[in-house]
Regions:
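Active-site neighborhoods and metal-handling regions in enzymes and metal-associated proteins
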Residues: 1-186
Length: 186
């Protein structure tokens, strides 16, 4: 979308503990060997349609704990991508990801007065609004709906990880529209 003239607005580049707030835009220096969330959501000025994509990287070397967190979120997104199809309940997908994260040792809870873990939605509709119906929660998915799929885990002291891609729901699955690779270390 950027190559076609899309205009990015309010891009998120948040590292370290700033990346533990899913909507924190980020400020200040980005430190080597810390998780950095890059969330870009360009809008096509001609059609008015939005794109949305998130990648999480480490500039330098990832620790074992960072790598495990990153791989677990990737596994959660892959689970969602396998399950999405017309007729499925979005909440079933959301709960399956929650269960996977908990099984891998990443609970969702309140620590020191702050939410940690998987405390935001699995995804949302995308089109003429950046966040529109349907949410990937308690709703039956329909053929040709356009959604983001963006599970994330957030733990201050370790960092945040989110992988986000845009898909079109089909009768038999989903078609991934995002084409940018996922790479942990850059």
């Amino acid at each position: 979308m950027l190559r076609a003239g899309g205009t990015p607005t309010n891009t998120i580049v948040a590292g370290g503990d700033q990346a533990c707030d899913p909507h924190e835009r980020g400020s200040g220096p980005l430190y080597a060997n810390s998780l950095i969330i890059l969330d870009i959501f360009p809008r096509d000025p001609k059609s008015g349609y939005w794109g949305d994509m998130t990648r999480t990287v480490v500039r330098g070397r990832a620790s074992d704990a960072q790598r495990k967190l990153w791989e677990t979120v990737k596994e959660g997104q892959e689970l969602a991508l396998r399950e999405i199809k017309a007729g499925i309940d979005g909440m079933k997908i959301h709960k399956a990801i929650q269960a996977l994260f908990k099984k891998r040792g990443y609970p969702t809870e309140v620590r020191k007065g702050k939410n940690v873990g998987f405390f935001h939605g699995t995804g949302h509709g995308l089109g003429l609004e950046i966040h529109e119906y349907p949410r990937l929660q308690k709703v039956t998915l329909k053929d040709r709906q356009v959604l983001t799929v963006e599970p994330g885990l957030y733990y201050p002291g370790l960092g945040g990880v989110r992988h986000e891609d845009v898909v079109v729901v089909t009768k038999t699955g989903c078609k991934i529209l995002s084409r940018f690779p996922k790479q942990l270390e850059i």
